Amino acid sequence: VGSLGYGVGSLTEETKSLFSTTGPGVDIYAAGEYIISATSTTNKFSAPSYYGNASFKQTNISGTSMASPQVCGLGALHLQANPHWTPAQLKDRLTKDAEARLQDGGLTAYSTHTNIMGGNNRIMLSRYANAVPFSSNVAGLKKR
């Protein structure tokens, strides 16, 4: 999973993040810059209290560790609707449903003339607004 610039403050929206790898192992990209995330109260980065509650804080974090959970969450929704899928089928669905629309935000480690060498696929969460059915084995739980 690679990171792309997205969100408030990003100067490279819809472009591969400069810190994200460009190698052939990257099959899909998701937003990974300026993601609001929870953080501990002892975090070395300055983080404001969440609505004045000092027991936990939030901050903007950038990295592929912010992009990966989005791809995993989308994969989990697919597996909920299709529990018989193999890992290869899931990967195929995720990459085929993505849009090939990214640009490389900077020079790659492989060549100064080569754009993203792996997949240039950006996940499109909006495509799944109502596509995955809700199911649960918890009694009394209903979709709103």
Identify the residue ranges that each predicted region occupies.
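Weak global preference for isoleucine
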Residues: 28, 35-36, 61, 116, ...
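Hydrolase catalytic cores
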Residues: 32-111
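C-terminal subdomain of the subtilisin-like protease fold in secreted/lumenal serine endopeptidases
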Residues: 7, 15, 80-144
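Short glycine/serine/threonine-biased micro-segments
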Residues: 21, 61, 71, 116-117
